[in-house]
C-alpha cells in the first residue's frame, strides 16, 4: 500500500497523545503539519480504504524510491524566481482560481488523473528543463514527480510539505503566494501564515464560494451557488431545504 494520509483536530494535549500512539505503532516517515482553527474543522470521523491515496491510475510511479528533489520553504522563493524554472500548480482548476504562486502554470485539470494528458500535450519538450511543482500538502507532488522522473524528466523539484507548509513557515512580507489555499475541511480556505480564509462552501455541490459569489442571486445558503444553480433536481433541492431547516432547529 501507499501508506496513510489523515487529518484530525482537537485540543493540543489530545493531538500529542494521538501522535505518540501512531509512533508507537511503528509508522515510518511520520511527517506531521500543524495549524490552528477557530472552528472545529470536522463534524464526523471518516475512514476510507483506497487503492491510491490520490488517484493517478498509473503503474509508472514509485514514490518510495524515486521522486523529485524536496525544496524547503526557505529555499522555494529563490527557485521559483529563477526565470529558467517552469513552475507548475498540480491542483485542480477551482483550487488554482482561489490562489497560487505568481507565474505558475495552470494545467486546467478537473482531476489529478488529467495531469498525465497535460504533461504529454504541453511539456514533452521540457524534459531537460528545471521543473518546480507544488500542491496543497505535498502528496500529489510525491506521485507526479515520481511519474515525471520515470518519464525522463531530469530536474524535477517539489515544494516540501506543500503550500500549507510554505504558508506556515513563510512570513506574509516574504511570501510569493497570492490569494487563498483551499483546504479539505470546514475552514474551506487559509491565507498567508495559515490565517483563516474568506471562502464559504456550497453544501449542494461542494464548490468554494467567494465573498463576491455570496452576493449572487444564484446563491442560496446550503441550496445552490453559481457553480450548481440550475443543475440540481427539484427533489435534491427540497432535501437540501429540509436539511437547512433541521440544522436551524438543532441550533
Predicted regions and their residues:
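Internal catalytic-core helix/loop-beta-alpha segment
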Residues: 66-82
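Rhodanese-like catalytic fold shared by cysteine-dependent sulfurtransferases
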Residues: 1-67, 92-131, 139-251
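Structural scaffold elements adjacent to functional motifs in cytosolic proteins
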Residues: 88-89
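Hydrophobic "anchor" residues on beta-strands that sit immediately upstream
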Residues: 85
Amino acid at each position: 500500500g501507499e501508506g496513510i494520509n489523515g487529518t484530525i483536530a482537537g485540543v493540543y494535549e489530545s493531538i500529542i497523545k494521538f501522535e505518540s500512539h501512531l509512533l508507537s505503532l511503528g509508522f515510518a516517515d511520520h511527517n506531521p503539519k500543524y495549524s490552528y482553527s477557530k472552528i472545529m474543522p470536522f463534524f464526523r470521523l471518516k475512514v476510507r480504504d483506497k487503492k491510491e491515496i490520490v488517484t493517478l491510475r498509473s503503474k509508472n510511479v514509485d514514490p518510495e524510491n524515486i521522486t523529485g528533489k524536496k525544496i524547503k520553504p526557505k529555499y522555494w522563493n529563490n527557485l521559483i524566481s529563477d526565470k529558467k524554472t517552469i513552475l507548475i500548480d498540480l491542483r485542480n482548476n477551482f483550487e488554482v482560481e482561489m490562489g497560487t504562486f505568481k507565474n505558475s502554470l495552470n494545467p486546467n485539470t478537473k482531476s489529478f488523473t488529467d495531469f498525465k494528458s497535460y504533461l504529454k500535450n504541453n511539456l514533452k519538450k521540457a524534459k531537460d528543463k528545471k521543473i518546480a511543482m507544488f500542491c496543497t500538502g505535498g502528496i500529489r507532488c510525491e506521485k507526479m514527480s515520481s511519474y515525471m522522473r520515470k518519464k525522463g524528466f531530469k530536474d524535477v523539484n517539489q515544494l516540501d510539505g506543500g503550500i500549507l507548509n510554505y504558508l506556515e513557515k513563510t512570513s506574509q512580507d516574504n511570501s510569493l503566494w497570492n490569494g487563498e489555499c483551499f483546504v479539505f475541511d470546514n475552514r474551506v480556505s487559509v491565507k498567508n501564515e495559515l490565517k483563516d480564509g474568506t471562502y464559504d462552501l456550497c453544501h449542494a455541490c461542494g464548490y468554494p464560494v467567494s465573498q463576491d459569489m455570496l452576493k449572487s442571486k444564484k446563491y442560496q445558503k446550503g441550496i445552490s451557488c453559481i457553480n450548481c444553480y440550475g443543475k440540481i433536481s427539484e427533489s435534491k433541492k427540497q432535501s437540501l431545504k429540509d436539511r437547512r431547516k433541521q440544522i436551524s432547529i438543532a441550533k
